[in-house]
Amino acid sequence: MAYKAEHNKYRELWKRDNGPMIGKWDIDYSYYSPVDYGADKKKKYPLCIVLVGALEGAFEGLEIQANEMPVWCDEKYQSRFYNGGSYLMIPRAPEEDGIYWDQSCLVDSLKAAIVDFCDKHENVDKSRIYLLGWCLGSLGAMNLASAYPELFAATVLMAPDRAITKSEAERLREMPVWLMAAKTDTHSFYHFNALPTWKLLCSTTNNKLNLRLTTYLRAVDVYLVHNAVAMCNHNLWDNVSEDLHFEGVPYDRDKIISGSYKGMKTVDGTGAVLYDPHIISWLSKFTNDGRSAIRTPALNKTVSEKAYIRFNEDFMHEAHQKIFAVLGVIYRKLGWL
């Protein structure tokens, strides 16, 4: 999905602040407060934290200009959250210092910014803090969630740039995790990153119903402005910004998503195929003091994890993915990625 200028009306509702200085950094961020726009001040509301990808934090404010997540302050999305609203927070990595979300040196500074935000906004429901991230931001989410699992109720990892480690997966064994990846992503390779992550999560979790894996055969390409290099099928977050409805058109039985998203399929940790999955309703089921899950009706029949994670031969043979992997290594050595 291209940048939507009409979403600027939502960006104008966001404010800026920063957390306390921890070590070398005080993390600045953009945020939306539902109580500033009519939400009942007697209620508590979830907090959704989104860690964006590299280059989206190049300067202050870009973190809400470079993607469409600010649209979640629209009433149609706010109304889907527990208690009918949610705080939204998009922190910015100090990229001007060459530091990105994948670097563990930011974990304590980011955690301090979140705690400080909750202290400043008394209507935040501290049992419903949700953490989302994509690309390098998903690595920041892995780092933070595994370091402080008690802080978060659930996490969503999109197009991770590396596989989770065994120790990280073990620390997340009680946390609901939704993993998303495109099997044809030429930047974050499915077989190297997402697939091993899924296997480790499934083998360590205390509740497989709390896990979800969404894969695509086609997603949106990403172009790096400074060198015009395409990261094919890498952008999954535009679809997340639409709560997987994508302009009101949900996941359908023909495996087609409106626009560039095709071949979307979602399963839980048991291998059950899930019909019509949506991010916000899934997040809203969880608290960090009483994790639970309600099984979503399966589409057709339950399939095994082993059967699901193989490529669907109707769309693409596994060898094609290996070719993409080899090309990616070559492109990186040539400096094209």
Q: What would you call each of these model-derived segments?
A:
Residues G84, R171-V177:
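Short, proline-enriched alpha-helix->beta-strand connector loops that line the catalytic pocket
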Residues Y45-L47, L51-S109:
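Active-site machinery of serine-nucleophile hydrolases
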Residues L62-E63, F189-S203:
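Short alpha-helix in the alpha/beta-hydrolase fold that links the catalytic acid
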Residues S127-R171:
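Primarily recognizes the serine-hydrolase "nucleophile elbow" in alpha/beta-hydrolase
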Residues A58-E60, D97-W101, S138-M142, R162-E168, ...:
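Extracytoplasmic/secreted cell-surface and envelope-processing proteins
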Residues Y37-K43, G98-C135:
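Gly/Ser-rich "nucleophile elbow"/oxyanion-hole loop immediately N-terminal to the catalytic nucleophile
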Residues M1-L47, L132-W134, L139, T197, ...:
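A domain-start/cap signature at the N-terminus of enzymes
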Residues M180, T186, F192, S203-Y331:
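C-terminal catalytic histidine-bearing segment of alpha/beta-hydrolase fold enzymes
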